[in-house]
Amino acid sequence: FAGHGDTMELPGGGEMGYLIPVDGSTNDLYLSSIGMAELRNLALMSKAKHVLYLVDACYGGLAAVGTRGLIPTETNNYIDKISKNKARQIITAGGKGEKVLEKSELGHSVFTVNLRRGLQEGNADVNSDGYITGNELAMYLEEKVTNDSENMQTPHYGRMTSDEGEIIFVSS
């Protein structure tokens, strides 16, 4: 998804993030936008083993759970294990109150440019093992987007379930 995001404060405390489509309205988020709870439900209903949402929008209320995955250096056959387990992951371009930075000289947003560099050029293969995991991609984007946007936006990453799998890309 590339577009806008917004956050609505909930009456009972907390907040809910929304993705706003081109015909959506910030004055009517619930009826005209896609709530993160709905996005999470779609991920849970999917029969796919691995789901990664890449959201080129900034908002709060990330639909993630606070679990940690397996640790590569401490897990035998790490790639084998994370590829066998289900994964529901999300990476967003930034958080609540931030704006997606578009640079005309780049032709895309800072998030999209770094996403392409990370995957197409293999720059997100942090440990140089020939694979780019969702976690590696998130760490790469967090560093590069934050720097390239001059601290105006910082990508957020999370898991939508407690599953320990990860999306995996083969590095070129």
Name every feature range the model reports, one short phrase each.
Residues F1-S172:
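Cysteine endopeptidase catalytic domains of the caspase/legumain-like
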